[in-house]
Amino acid sequence: MRPSKRAADELRPVSLERAVSRYAEGSCLVSFGNTRVLCTASLEERAPPWLRGSGKGWVTAEYAMLPRATHERTRREVGSGKPSGRTQEIQRLIGRSLRAVTNLPAMGERQITIDCDVIQADGGTRTAAITGAWVALHDCFAWMRTRSIISVDPLRDHVAAVSCGLYKGTPVLDLDYAEDSAAETDANFVLTGRGGIVEVQGTAEMEPFTQEQLLELLGLARAGTERLVALQKEAIA
């Protein structure tokens, strides 16, 4: 049995609260159980240097954890002068995931930065961040359209993410920290609303996993992201 008493294919309670920032062009406070991430979208009226003159825009992301997002205080990364390898990996993942469903030329030569700040971490921070970041980006584009900055919605599809893993030999969906720290296999799946695969990250912590187990995890992830996309649609309705 899972520590949370959830069924193998059961998500944690998920909430997507919009417009939580007074100043950001788009914002969302996303909760996956006890994991909470604040996602804000900020518009800049210029593209990165390598895109100037191309007619295309850019969506990028930054990710950070507040010092007391974890059981014990962690030092702010600003003190070390640069983000850790883990932080860089996660923020690139978030950016890639959002760009996969964005029509960049429809943005014009502008950049949107999505800041994902983990308020409380209990496993699955990157997957929660991607799911909430999409809502913040959606609202940023809506803000731009109401002000005639752009004429069409650059978003081509939804994108959401969820973790899956093998816990005591059983494929399970949406691992919390207790499960993640004891799982034999941990994987993250990023999928679009139409079911396209944006990214799969999977690691065997103990024994290697089989192709059949990977497909089982993918099946769980598909069902989970379908529910997350439904929640996104409900949130923006």
Curated annotation (Swiss-Prot):
UniProt gene name: rph
Reactions performed catalytically: tRNA(n+1) + phosphate = tRNA(n) + a ribonucleoside 5'-diphosphate
Catalytic activity, EC: 2.7.7.56
Protein name: Ribonuclease PH
Domain of life: Bacteria
Keywords for this protein: Nucleotidyltransferase, RNA-binding, rRNA processing, Transferase, tRNA processing, tRNA-binding
Function, in words: Phosphorolytic 3'-5' exoribonuclease that plays an important role in tRNA 3'-end maturation. Removes nucleotide residues following the 3'-CCA terminus of tRNAs; can also add nucleotides to the ends of RNA molecules by using nucleoside diphosphates as substrates, but this may not be physiologically important. Probably plays a role in initiation of 16S rRNA degradation (leading to ribosome degradation) during starvation.
Disulfide bond annotation, renumbered to this chain: none
InterPro entries assigned to the protein according to its UniProt record, in alphabetical order: ExoRNase_PH_dom1, ExoRNase_PH_dom2, ExoRNase_PH_dom2_sf, PNPase/RNase_PH_dom_sf, Ribosomal_Su5_D2-typ_SF, RNase_PH, RNase_PH_bac-type, RNase_PH_CS
GO biological process: rRNA catabolic process; rRNA processing; tRNA processing
Molecular functions (GO terms): 3'-5'-RNA exonuclease activity; tRNA binding; tRNA nucleotidyltransferase activity
Database matches in HAMAP family: RNase_PH
Regions annotated as coiled coil: none
Similarity-based family: Belongs to the RNase PH family.
Organism this protein belongs to: Methylobacterium radiotolerans (strain ATCC 27329 / DSM 1819 / JCM 2831 / NBRC 15690 / NCIMB 10815 / 0-1)
